[in-house]
Swiss-Prot record:
This is Fructose-1,6-bisphosphatase class 3. It is an enzyme of class 3 (hydrolase). Its EC number is 3.1.3.11. Disulfide bonds: none annotated. InterPro entries: FBPtase_class3, Metallo-depent_PP-like.
């Protein structure tokens, strides 16, 4: 088998010189400094804030500009140049508007092209020429390379270089070149992006985030709880589908469902209009400018889908005793005559109920109309071209956890008990814990995705368990109290008890134990965690357990910013070490364009490398070394006999 593979490879490397050249090239790359990794998390559909962080590389762009031009140009010009790199098309329009004469604009073009070339050259200093070529604007690759590789000893060619720039301006191509070089800079300052979960949730534009990621040069995703809900819905889970519609109704984001993904909500609206009225518990968290009739419409949809969700949960709980969720059979605990429910031995009055479609004798039974609505919605979801594209990308680039360059990336938690031991769950008569449990969760999720026609098998039910189950690494609480929040006034019933992981992650020994569970070196590795907003306002530190745990909820969701005191955190990891970046609230692109101010506040060093880290010490390096080994075998097999 191996010789057949080597024969195939020999078609590409058909002489010894080609093999040797590639070996030299790969071995040289192994000794370059490692590229910069950029970690973001909890985007929650907030596209504008996310794409700003992406464009500025969590401050890397301005840092590079300062490295070159500090003391050479004014701070105001540094801000202007940074804004030009972030939003080249918009900034160019504003700048051109300020010039009275063509001559003055042309002088500005010359100066700016020189600066942009210097910036690209500096940002690409640790990359090979071939990697730089891929990052350059395709239509100007040759011209850009000529300008980039101009040396100090180029006196003989000075006029040649000047003429290139003169002609670019004369032929009306300056805007295109500057724009292309701006995007090259963005691409060069970050080698690889990690999205540590929750692209979806309450924000209005998760689809735009997905499009941005699909077009990004190098990315991976660690699924969040909200991402899995969307994957589950596309995979055939009706209860996951009910949840995403309920959340969109609650946060007045039904446009995502209907306008963005083309899912017809008319049958659901008809059902809602028939059975439900206005209800304060189900009014959306809507824009104040929304007309009252629209708010009432959403309120009715919200009730209709919430009641369908509660009904759909019951059969899963009953057919999956190993989920250990019998306590959540809430519709069966209600005294419908008295409008009361008994939880943990205490009876509570229910408020703002909407049980018009509930049969007290068989409360989890869907009306025929409800079942029809869910069938139509699921058909619509599974036949949405755009959603299919987004979910396929999510599966291709995503995983529940990732081991990358010695670090463990995970959105939620590793389920542990009070002593820090891995919690065990029985699945198909076998006990799973720690890494094995997460692996089995991911296997079921992929199985459900591969068989969207199955709607009530174990794999599909497991996608819902990942959203709400006690031992789910994505949920990390004992129970989800959605029902109680809608219908019970007493706040004690709303509390969701967190897994001990969330206080044990402050403890270095517990974090080292988790790193070892995943086969990572606890002396050098870190756990990089999303999911929970860091309450800096109350003095919480995102760097925990003596630097072993780094919590980087990006805080993109505006709803949490009042409790955190900041917008959130991102992380940078380059060849020199790790830096945590705190962000202020992002107001608007217009503000950045007009003032050049940034949303960054402070950077903190998490870890400093004693020696500059090289490519050979990374995941990419491991793959390159495997390629070198294969090429050396090919050389021996074909060319050294």
């Amino acid at each position: 088998m191996e010789t057949k593979y080597l024969d195939l490879l020999a078609q590409k490397y058909d002489c010894e010189e080609k093999v040797v050249t590639e070996i030299i090239n790969l071995k040289a790359i192994l000794n370059l400094p490692k590229g910069t990794e950029h970690f973001v998390s909890d985007l929650h559909g907030e596209y504008q804030a996310f794409q700003h962080v992406l464009r500025n590389g969590s401050g890397r762009v301005k840092e590079k500009i300062r490295d070159i031009f500090s003391g050479v140009i004014y701070d105001r010009e540094i801000d202007e140049l940074a804004a030009l790199v972030y939003y080249p098309e918009d900034k160019l329009k504003l700048i051109k508007h300020d010039f009275d004469t063509k001559e003055a604009l042309n002088e500005w073009y010359k100066e700016t092209i020189h600066r942009m070339i210097k910036l690209v050259s500096y940002c690409s200093s640790k990359y090979t020429r071939s990697k730089l070529r891929k990052a350059l604007p395709a239509q100007f690759a040759y011209i850009s390379e000529e300008l980039l590789y101009k040396t100090e000893q180029a006196a003989n060619k000075e006029q040649y270089y000047s003429e290139i720039i003169e002609q670019i301006i004369a032929l009306g191509q300056a805007d295109k070149l500057i724009t292309g070089l701006a995007y090259s800079t963005q691409r060069l300052v970050v080698d690889h992006l990690h999205v540590v979960g929750d692209i979806y949730d309450r924000g209005p534009q998760p689809d735009k985030i997905m499009e941005e990621l699909i077009n990004y040069h190098s990315v991976d995703i660690q699924w969040g709880n909200h991402d899995v809900l969307w994957i589950g819905a596309y995979s055939g889970s009706k209860v996951c589908l009910a949840n995403i519609i309920r959340i969109c109704a609650r946060y007045d984001n039904l446009d995502i469902i209907e306008d963005v993904y083309g899912i017809n909500l008319r049958p659901l609206l008809n059902l809602a209009e028939k059975y439900y009225d206005d209800n304060p518990s189900f009014r959306p968290k809507a824009d104040e400018n929304r007309p009252e009739d629209e708010i009432k419409q959403i309120t009715k949809i919200h009730q209709a889908i919430a009641m369908i969700q509660f009904k759909l949960e019951s059969p899963i709980i009953k057919r999956r005793p190993n989920f250990n969720m019998e306590e959540r059979l809430l519709l069966e605990k209600i005294d419908y005559d008295r409008n009361e429910i008994t939880l943990n031995g205490k009876t509570y009055q229910l408020e703002n109920t909407c049980f018009a479609t509930v049969n007290p004798k068989q409360p989890d039974e869907l009306l025929e109309e409800e079942a029809e609505v869910m069938d139509k919605l699921l058909f619509s979801v599974q036949n949405s071209e755009k959603l299919g594209r987004h979910m396929n990308f999510m599966m291709k680039k995503g995983s529940l956890y990732l081991k990358y360059n010695g670090n463990l990336l995970i959105h939620g938690c590793i389920p542990v008990d009070e002593n820090g031991s891995m919690e065990t769950m029985m699945i198909e008569d076998k006990a799973y814990a720690g890494r094995e449990l997460l692996d089995v969760f991911e296997r079921f999720l992929r199985e459900a995705f591969a068989h969207p026609e199955e709607t009530d098998d174990l794999a599909t039910d497991m996608t819902w368990y990942l959203w709400t189950g006690e031992y789910s690494s994505l949920f990390g609480k004992r129970a989800m109290t959605t029902f109680e929040r809608y219908f019970i006034k007493e706040k004690e019933t709303h509390k969701e008890k967190k897994n001990p992981y969330y206080y044990l992650r402050e403890d270095e020994a517990a974090c080292r134990n988790i790193l070892m569970e995943f086969g990572l070196n606890p002396d050098h590795g870190h756990i990089i965690n999303g999911h929970t907003p860091v309450k800096e306002i109350e003095g919480e530190d995102p760097i925990k357990a003596n630097g072993k745990m780094i919590v980087i909820d990006g805080g993109f969701s505006k709803a949490y910013q009042s409790t955190t005191g900041i917008a959130g955190y991102t992380l940078l990891y380059n060849s020199y070490g790790m830096q945590l970046v705190a962000h202020k609230h992002f107001n608007s692109k217009a503000e950045v364009l007009s003032t050049g101010t940034d949303v960054l506040t402070v950077k903190r060093l998490v870890d400093k490398e004693l020696e500059r880290k090289k490519v050979k010490e990374t995941n990419v390096g491991e793959e390159l070394m495997k390629e070198v080994a294969i090429l050396e075998k090919l050389r021996e097999y074909r060319y050294m006999k």
